[in-house]
A protein has these predicted regions:
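N-terminal signal peptide c-region/cleavage motif recognized by signal peptidases
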Residues: 16-18
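Surface-exposed loop and turn segments in beta-propeller and other repeat-based domains
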Residues: 73-90
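Sec-dependent N-terminal signal peptides
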Residues: 6-11
Length: 183
């Protein structure tokens, strides 16, 4: 009897641990402009497209439009702040789009990293439609530079302001396809 109970307990633990989700990233798309404005068109997949207008000057700005062949709906993110770095008299702005998949449910997301906390976004993709799943601009008192890190079991948003780093853990609500941030 004891052997049966131990076997059942071990099986329950094994099954419970096998359903936890892992985050898997794809190859990032990095777009940059040097002192001026540029438009980019890139394929995210065979049926998904991303159009970007990126500006670097005193301030950096980006307009992004996510579209699909299968749907007329599009998601536009406008006037996102982009970090501008000055080197040798040139103003450079960089934008990184990283595909992200949750292997437990197959849900697909795109991390939008502008280098500025107010421009950090996560876009979800499901059923041939894009949706804004997270915007760091909606967090209270979040300014400064930022970047995402993807660990096996969690997503983190790092925000740096005046030499102080705050780290937010991003949790996915699979029903609404949105993320909440906890400091």
């Amino acid at each position: 009897m004891r052997k049966i109970l131990l076997t059942a307990a071990f099986a329950a633990l094994t099954l419970a641990s096998s359903v936890s989700a892992n985050w898997i990233t794809g190859e990032p798309t990095i777009l940059a402009v040097n002192s001026g404005e540029a438009a980019f068109h890139t394929a995210l997949t065979s049926d998904q497209r991303l159009d970007v207008n990126l500006t670097a000057g005193e301030e950096g700005k980006a307009d992004l439009t996510f579209t699909t062949k299968a749907s007329e709906s599009a998601l536009s993110l406008t006037a996102l702040p982009v970090l501008v770095s000055e080197e040798a008299g040139f103003a450079d702005a960089k934008l990184t789009i990283t595909p992200l998949v949750n292997d437990a449910n197959g849900l697909r997301f795109y991390l939008v990293d502008t280098g500025e906390a107010g421009g950090a976004h996560i876009v979800s993709y499901k059923g041939a439609a894009f949706k804004s799943a997270f915007s760091a601009a909606e967090l209270q008192d979040v300014t400064g530079t930022s970047y995402f890190t993807v660990e096996k079991k969690q997503l983190l948003l790092h925000v740096n302001e005046n030499g102080t780093e705050d780290i937010y853990t991003l949790s996915l609500d699979t029903k609404s396809l949105t993320f909440t941030a906890v400091k």
